[in-house]
Amino acid sequence: MTTTTQSEQDRVIIFDTTLRDGEQCPGATMTFEEKLNVARMLDDMGVDVIEAGYPFASDGDFEAVHEIAKRSKNSVICGLSRAAHKDIDRCAEAIKPAERGRIHTFLSTSPVHMKYKLQMEAAQVYEMVISSVTRARNHTDDVEWSAEDATRTEFDFLCRCIEAAIKAGATTINLPDTVGYAVPEEYRELFRKVRETVPNSDKARFSVHCHNDLGMAVANSMAGVAGGARQIECTINGIGERAGNAALEEVVMAMRVRQDKLPYWNRIETTMLTHASKTVSAATSFPVQYNKAIVGRNAFAHESGIHQDGMIKNAQTYEIMTPETVGVKGTSLVMGKHSGRAGLIHKMEELGYKLSRNQIEDVFVRFKALADRKKDVYDEDIEALVDEQLLHGQDQIKLMSLTVIAGTHGPQRATMKLDVDGQIRIEEAEGNGPVDAVFNCIKALVPHDAKLELYQVHAVTEGTDAQAEVSVRLSHEGRSMTARAADPDTLVASAKAYLGALNKIVAKRQRSVREDAPTVAVAG
């Protein structure tokens, strides 16, 4: 957050594109409810601009952007659009309910993109820049234009396009490092030279959008700001296409911790960063790497004796920020089988969750069941319970019961009962091991041709009674769907995770039946 002594000139707008560029990451597809949940969290956290999706891509994307626009209280709601007029008009319709809406239109400007992707001459691209921005400006005063693959674009042509876009009404100019090719010094110089060369550059805010292909997305983002950009486009956990995007939590904390070298400020409530990371991880079923900066499990862990000794004497010996600054409060052992509804509600609020009365009741029932099986219920256990309720509460296929017979000799056999859209089904199946038997049972109960791409297990907490958290990724018709589930029984968690991915496939198929939009390429 900021103080009254900080100038508006040094403010950096945080533009979150988790719901658009982040969701383009293979396997990271989110359901409608998951998108609403993530958007609400971003809005509460102080994100200035939420790029909520690509309305022309599908009816599902349109509906999500439209609903987020209706519900947002603080953030500008932005929709992405190609340079085509029909895309822009659809985007305008999607963001219409927003108190403050933005249209973000883009066009490739690099020689390789113009020749092979657009198959257009530079003169045609130049005219389309003017046409698209003008069209968008007819709908809203807040228009962003992106020169896709700006870092591989000829400088003179880039400046001409930027000047034309600003003259046509663009209020934000984004120069994305689409393929993660730039290095910090040249990216800083690009912004400095563009702002120095383009005669009307003072009429627009400049923006960075960096991909992490060479591991320099955050460094490049900060370099762009040093060169004069005042908007950073980023995603929670750095998710995105290929190697991902600049991570929101990293750019925000870089500005917070290194004010001596990065004298800029933003409006993000940093104590929500860890919760935001976990929310997006749960929605996408993408685990956060243990050594991830700021929000990783080991970000504030110290194992070596020398480090521990230093921490005991003075935390500043090995910590450049406090865990509390980013919302890490440490694991607590206060919850158990004697805890009541009020205690659970308080704990969930402490962890950053806001649930409806029905959702609270469902979580409480499962919490009591877990507490009967587990001596201590950690914060991570409660987060797993809540995430499962939020992500799988509306599933059409639900696990009712599971029995597995396994041993060193003889067949591994699973018996399962499912509720499939209100219909109870029971089946028994064998497999090459208990997990294989469980998955074969699901295939027998719900016939499908999805292929298993990933099966991963790790413990939510420590100890032999820890919940197992299982991630499953299924591939179907060229799309990957990932789901995650937790349970003290690894096989139950495995079944729930598999069913979670299958439910996403079912939901996607149902949306596809209703949709009749062409497949479209999106900006990076």
Curated annotation (Swiss-Prot):
Biological process (GO), any one: L-leucine biosynthetic process
MF terms (GO), sorted A to Z: 2-isopropylmalate synthase activity; acetyl-CoA C-acetyltransferase activity; manganese ion binding
Record keywords: Amino-acid biosynthesis, Branched-chain amino acid biosynthesis, Cytoplasm, Leucine biosynthesis, Manganese, Metal-binding, Transferase
Record's GO cellular component terms: cytosol
Annotated stretches, region: Regulatory domain: 398-524
SMART domains (alphabetical): LeuA_dimer
Pfam families according to UniProt: HCS_D2 (PF22617), HMGL-like (PF00682), LeuA_dimer (PF08502)
Top EC class, one word: transferase
InterPro entries: 2-IPM_HCS-like, 2-isopropylmalate_synth_dimer, AIPM/Hcit_synth_CS, Aldolase_TIM, LeuA/HCS_post-cat, LeuA_allosteric_dom_sf, LeuA_bact_synth, PYR_CT
Reaction catalysed by this enzyme: 3-methyl-2-oxobutanoate + acetyl-CoA + H2O = (2S)-2-isopropylmalate + CoA + H(+)
EC number: 2.3.3.13
Localization per Swiss-Prot or TrEMBL: Cytoplasm
Pathways per UniProt: Amino-acid biosynthesis; L-leucine biosynthesis; L-leucine from 3-methyl-2-oxobutanoate: step 1/4
Cofactor list: Mn(2+)
Residues binding Mn(2+), per UniProt: 21, 209, 211, 245
Primary localisation category: cytoplasm
Limits of the Pyruvate carboxyltransferase domain: 12-274
Family from the record: Belongs to the alpha-IPM synthase/homocitrate synthase family. LeuA type 1 subfamily.
Function text: Catalyzes the condensation of the acetyl group of acetyl-CoA with 3-methyl-2-oxobutanoate (2-ketoisovalerate) to form 3-carboxy-3-hydroxy-4-methylpentanoate (2-isopropylmalate).
Subunit structure: Homodimer.
Protein name: 2-isopropylmalate synthase
Species, as recorded: Rhodopseudomonas palustris (strain TIE-1)
Gene: leuA
